[in-house]
Amino acid sequence: LSINQKSTEKNQKIIRDFLYKQISENKQSNILFDRSVIDNYIYSLALYDKGEASLEFLNETFDLVMRHLDFLDGVILIPTAASIKLVSDNLRDVDVNYIDKINRYFIKTLLLINKTRPLAVFVISVSREERIKLAGDIHRYMNYKMRL
């Protein structure tokens, strides 16, 4: 599937439906997902802004984001390009302007979500080794918080 700037509404729908199904059907605890329907909404919003996705699709995706929150205890945001060296690997986008736009969309969307639905958001912008350690610390914190 084409992703990032090369994605399409059709591809975003396939990805969105897969992500939603993956998290909503998983009954285990203590799981970290590296992508969520929130990610999908952000990339769909970027497509919408370019006129390449419909408002109907965007609204449908946001509705799924809000339902998706029932399955999340928190979100870890790792802004790309802030601490992660951009490498052209044919998977990730390396266009700094696009990445900055995506990072801004994430921040705006997470703030919007938090106005109506409190969600723990952790921003990690450090080296890979430190990200792994901090993710473990966040995991322990979330487990502690759930026991209270």
Describe each region flagged by the PLM:
Residues 91-148:
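NTP-dependent small-molecule kinase module
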Residues 23, 36-105:
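ATP-dependent NMP and nucleoside kinases share a basic, alpha-helical "lid"
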Residues 27-31, 73:
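Loop/turn-to-beta-strand initiation segments
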Residues 10, 14, 57-60, 64, ...:
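Exposed alpha-helical structural elements
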Residues 18, 64, 68, 109, ...:
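Residues that form generic nucleotide/phosphate-binding pockets
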Residues 1-24:
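Conserved substrate/cofactor phosphate-moiety recognition/catalytic segment
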Residues 1-2, 30-37:
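Short low-complexity stretches enriched in small and charged residues
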